[in-house]
Amino acid sequence: MDGLPDAGKPPIAMKFGISTHLYHDQRLSREHLSAIAEAGFEAVELFATKSHFDYTDPAAINSLAQWLRETGLTLHSIHAPIWDVFGGTTGSSYSTAAADNAKRQAAVRQAEAALAIVRDIPASYMVVHLGTTDANNGENSRAAASRSLEEICQFAEPLGVRIAAEVIPNDLSSAHALVAMLERDFDGSTVGICLDFGHAHLMGDVADAIETAAEHLITTHVHDNRRRADEHLVPYRGTIDWPAALLMMQKIGYDGTYLMELAANGDPSAVLADAQRARQRFERALSE
């Protein structure tokens, strides 16, 4: 980040995007991207699940490139695979922090396969989960997580992509834990933090997580919940203190994209309309 804007300079231009997570239960289509663009959003994050978008299929990648050109959207980021089928109830799941090295390597290979999209479609970031939310299943090894992150960064650096470790509800991935790992094991040039507001809310105080991650914060996942489950609600539909959270984002001088990662809840078009209204509230709050 560039820090707080100097007095007399124009305000930071706010950028907003939507994750294709909104359509995660469907095969991604041009119509989905058109709806996002028509709702006034500038960017997308591709949720890389093979049942949603087959990132290993050259024809699918070519189609995505064409859809992005036609809709005027930018591919802001790619979410590294955590399953190969929506919902994770069938097929394979992937953990970059698996203690079993074969499982860990499988997760890294899938992340690299999804990241290879940027050879055809430019993107700035890949968002990576370190481990899983179940701390008792052998998937959350600190050493394995650090090794995986290093390997993915080595693959990403020549492609000009920065890796963002996501704040998720486990011991490896709180804002405090991620900062400790990055400052211990990485030089900061190719890896940072994706501040997931909803996940931070499940674990504690969102404003505190933002302040903790500040020097490493490079992208976001914006959604809400009622602190009972990871609901991926539109902002202001849960119990996050958004005025306090956005004030802290201003305080740390965040100048990146606010990327909404929302659940469809049966009606993606209604969610998009609600997201438009939330964006307007963000813009007003961040302009004060």
Model-derived features with residue positions:
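Conserved, mostly hydrophobic/aromatic
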Residues: 36, 44, 68, 107, ...
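Short, small-residue-enriched loops and turns at beta-alpha junctions
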Residues: 52-54, 82-84, 133-136, 169-173, ...
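Short helix-capping segments at alpha-helix termini
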Residues: 11, 70-73, 155-161, 184-190, ...
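Acidic/histidine-rich catalytic cores of soluble enzymes
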Residues: 43-44, 50, 78, 147-239
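Gly/Pro-rich active-site loop or hairpin
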Residues: 20, 33, 55, 90, ...
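Active-site acidic/histidine proton-transfer and metal-coordination neighborhood
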Residues: 7, 29-30, 85-192
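N-terminal pre-domain/capping segments
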Residues: 2-113, 119, 157, 215, ...
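Short acidic/polar active-site loop segments enriched in Thr and Asp
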Residues: 42, 74, 124, 218, ...
